[in-house]
Curated annotation (Swiss-Prot):
Disulfide bonds: none annotated. The keyword Transmembrane helix does not apply. Belongs to the pseudouridine synthase TruB family. Type 1 subfamily. InterPro entries: PsdUridine_synth_cat_dom_sf (IPR020103), PsdUridine_synth_N (IPR002501), PUA_sf (IPR036974), tRNA_psdUridine_synth_TruB (IPR014780), TruB_C (IPR032819). Responsible for synthesis of pseudouridine from uracil-55 in the psi GC loop of transfer RNAs. Gene3D superfamilies: Pseudouridine synthase, PUA domain. This is tRNA pseudouridine synthase B. GO terms for molecular function: RNA binding; tRNA pseudouridine(55) synthase activity. The keyword Plastid does not apply. GO terms for biological process: mRNA pseudouridine synthesis; tRNA pseudouridine synthesis. The active site is at 39 (nucleophile). CDD domains: PseudoU_synth_EcTruB (cd02573). It comes from Moorella thermoacetica (strain ATCC 39073 / JCM 9320). Transmembrane segments: none annotated.
Length: 305
């Protein structure tokens, strides 16, 4: 049975769903899903779960993401990227890199962001991008996101505009195009996303990603080195080693007492942990629950069989 994660290097021009469809064809497996949509025009890391690893996607998506983006300052479009209709053009003053970096400060830390109309957010049973295609715009509530890093790499004039290359590390649910557009508005000139590369999604990094062509070549050679174990996408969750005599309990979904496992990380009620064998095999994800005797239980939440 094929099961695990694939760290795919998505090319520009394909949707995230296109990548999933390609992998279904290559691996001859239907149960495949991706760990967070990457815009069609963007490139970079797209984690994909195969087989029963799809049950872990909700935990994978909790990890932070990192991007390298290029913005054009002085240009505004209705989609906040170069695929949209131009709304405004405004010549830029002679910005310095110090000016531009200082203007990123209001957009670091915990901020509120309004999803763009071209997003996949649901509104009354429909996706926002479906409404946008019909020329409609609706009110969208702002969402809280966290920007850990908004760092200017380089900026240079380009005719009446400025181009800025930025490294961004952020929480899930952050819209990079909107972050850039809001930054441009703060600078008084507007901004549009010109290029986007996702360099990290959780523990999946660009340097380890596989192109679809590389995956196809490996399959032709009878290799599966691109297929990572289920635990590969869960590095942010604490690991607890289950003693051999309790492995069957966990595999059957039976809760075990925390004090039978050693060593134990610092845990709180409600935490999600990885239960593994001494050999590193992922048995289940478990939730920490209180015990009547003042200790705690590890209740299997997602069992891998």
């Amino acid at each position: 049975m094929v099961m695990g994660f694939v760290n795919v290097l998505k090319p520009p021009g394909l949707t995230s769903h296109d990548v999933v469809q390609n992998l279904r064809r290559l691996l001859k497996v239907k149960r495949i899903g991706h760990g967070g949509t990457l815009d069609p025009l963007a490139a970079g890391v797209l984690p994909v779960a195969v087989g029963t690893a799809t049950r872990l996607l909700e935990y994978l998506q909790g990890g932070d993401k990192a991007y390298r983006a290029e913005f054009i300052l002085g240009l505004k479009t209705d989609t906040q990227d170069l695929g949209g209709r131009v709304l405004a053009r405004k010549p830029c003053p002679p910005f310095t890199e110090k000016d531009l970096q200082a203007a990123t400060r209001p957009f670091t830390g915990t901020i509120r962001q309004v999803p763009p109309m071209v997003s996949a957010v649901h509104y009354q049973g429909r996706r926002l991008y479906e409404l946008a295609r019909e020329g409609l715009e609706v009110e969208r509530p702002a969402r809280q996101v966290t920007i850990h890093e908004f760092r200017l790499i380089r900026a240079w004039p380009d005719g009446p505009y400025y181009r800025a290359l930025i490294d961004i590390t952020c929480s899930r649910g952050t819209y990079i195009r909107t972050l850039g557009a809001d930054w441009g508005d703060y600078l008084g000139v507007g901004a549009t996303l010109a290029f986007l590369l996702r360099t990290r999604a959780g523990s999946f990094r660009l340097t380890d990603a596989w192109t679809l062509e590389e995956i196809a070549g490996a399959i032709d050679r009878g290799e599966r080195t691109f297929l990572l174990p289920p635990a590969a996408g869960l590095a942010h969750l604490p690991v607890i080693i289950v003693p051999g005599e309790f492995i069957r309990h966990v595999s059957n979904g039976v809760a075990i007492k925390g004090d039978v496992c050693r060593p134990l990380p610092s845990l709180r009620e409600g935490d999600i942990v990885r239960l593994e064998t001494g050999e590193g095999q992922l048995l289940a994800l478990a939730r920490v629950e209180p015990d009547t005797r003042g200790s705690f239980l590890l209740k299997p939440h997602k069992v891998l069989k």
